[in-house]
Amino acid sequence: MNFYSSIRRVSLMAIIVWLASACFGQIPVEEATRLAQSGRWSEAHDLLQPAVQQNRDLANGHAWYVLGFIQKELHKNAGESGVDAPFRAQSVESFQLALAHQSLAQTERENSMEALDFLSRSYFREAIEMVEGFTYGAEKTIFDLMVRYEDIQRYLNPEFDKTEQRSDLHRYLAQAYSNLLETERFAETETEDEILDKAILHFESSLTMDAGNYATRYNYAITLYNHGVRQLKRINHNTSMFQLMEIQDACVALFEQSLPPMEQAHAQRPDRLETLKGLMTIHYALSQKDESDAYRRQMEQLLQKR
């Protein structure tokens, strides 16, 4: 056998191997699409997903696109939740793999991006729902969900700016921790101290990102003041003199700490009765009668104008 015959034989064998792989590794996209169109999502997934995973080199953008939509519907139908909800995470990956193919049709490209936006916002909505029904210890999961949302948004738009939403999230979490303090469930425990520290941390973090937010400043001041009042209300006939002095010192520190954010909120909106009342009350708690009376008079003048 001469050299050229050997080359032809090798080439023929390569073609046979390629044809065999094309036949046995065929991806049933059309059949999966028909199943999906008839609402048989699980069957469509069980047919398409293994074929795509086992033949990733053969899978084109369209195959990943179809798989992504099947996984998205399964996620919705299953009512999944949590950072690691499998169908949601798989759907995100499939759509991103579809978009990585330049051959993906323009309509499918646009639909993939819309689907990714929907999936990213589902992470965001879940994070906000967890803040609204906040329980102690949920913070890590909330931030993990937000990171998933931000990562997908940044994938869709490299110029995506998370600052405003992060500032809002810190403010919401600060208020959530403040609400936990109000329940008195953790009264006089180390956990209560941790909750107060977390509330302060999130108020400060929010103001770092949005220094001019009136609501953040006002609520920060109220949280500190109210916690001082709670300490005073716990004084009873069993409180020792030493404990009484400790409580008084802690309360004064909280009242003093609440003054700057309340003053800043008032400077921002000097016509708001709530900040005037807040300043009047804080100064009164600090035994600063002259300052308290001055804010009381400002309140009276403001009320007369209304």
Feature-to-residue mapping (PLM):
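Start-of-domain marker
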Residues: 26-89, 119
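Alpha-solenoid helical repeat scaffolds
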Residues: 42, 49, 89, 96, ...
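Short coil/linker segments at helix-helix boundaries
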Residues: 70-140, 178-201, 226-260
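Bacterial Sec-dependent N-terminal signal peptides
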Residues: 1-37
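Flexible helix-coil transition and linker loops at the boundaries of alpha-helical arrays
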Residues: 52-62, 77, 97-116, 150-169, ...
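Terminal, low-structured helical/coil segments at or just beyond the last alpha-helical repeat
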Residues: 236-260, 264-306
